[in-house]
C-alpha cells in the first residue's frame, strides 16, 4: 500500500496483518471516529510520520499486535487506550499532544514516550532508544500531567523519567532508575510509598524554599514516606520537609556561593538559609560586601 492510508470517521476494527512499503501514516482518526486494533501486525519499511494519528474527538483502542517502522508509533490529540501489544518508533514510540488523553494498561512502547497532555499509566513497559528524548524512556513535558501507579520504565526495570510538568506517583507497581525533575516540574505523592524513589532536582531557575514534592489528592506525606525519598542535588543545596506546607523544599547551604556584588551594590544580605533579603532581619543574617568579604550578623 502506498499513499496516506485510512482517514476514518466512524468505527473501524483491525485484526489482520498489514505490510507497508512507503506511507505517511496508516490510520488517521478524525473527530467522531473510532478505531479498534484487536490484533495483527503493522510492519512498515518507510513510514515518514506515524502509524496512527488520533485527532481531537477521535478514539483509538489498541489491544494486541506489533506496529513498527515509523518515525512515530502514534500521535494522539484525542483519546487513546493501550491494553497490550507492541508499539515502536524511531523518534518516539508515542507522543501525546496537549488536548490528548492516553490511558495505558499494558503493552510495550519502544523508542521513548513524550507527554504534553494527560497520560495515565497503570501497567506496561516503556523502552527508550528513540532519537527524540535521548537517554530518557519517558518525558513529561511542561504543561503535561502524568499519573503513574504501575509500569516498568526501562528494559530491565531501570530507566529514567524526565518531569517538566505535573507528575503524580501512587502505589508500588512501578519500577525505574530515577526521576529527573526539571525547574518547572512538580511531583505529587498520592498514596503510601512502598518503594524508594530517587529524584534528581535541576536547580536552574528553580524557586528555592518552594514545595517541589508534595502530597496530592488529599494524601499527606508521612515520616515513613519521607524515608523512602532520595533526592540528589548539586553541591551547595539541601532539602527538607516543611510540614506547614506539606511538601519538600530545596534550600541553599552556602547561600552566597556564586553571588557577585558589583560596585553599585555595595552590600547584599542573605538569611540563614541563603535566601537573598532586602535588609537585615531578626535572627542570623549573612552579609557580603563588594570587596568579597562575608560576615555573619545576629539581630535580636
Which stretches of residues belong to each language-model region?
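Glycine-rich beta-solenoid repeat tracts in large extracellular/virion proteins
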Residues: 4-8, 21, 25-30, 43-45, ...
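All-beta strand scaffolds that present successive hydrophobic residues in beta-strands
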Residues: 12-15, 20, 31, 35-38, ...
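Hydrophobic alpha-helical segments, especially N-terminal targeting/anchoring helices
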Residues: 29, 54, 241-243, 270, ...
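Extracellular/surface-exposed low-complexity segments
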Residues: 151, 170-174, 181-253
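Residue-level detector of functionally pivotal "anchor" positions at catalytic/ligand-binding pockets or at interdomain
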Residues: 251-273
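A glycine-anchored, Pro-Gly-centered beta-turn/N-cap motif
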Residues: 281-285
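C-terminal tail/sorting-segment detector
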Residues: 286-300
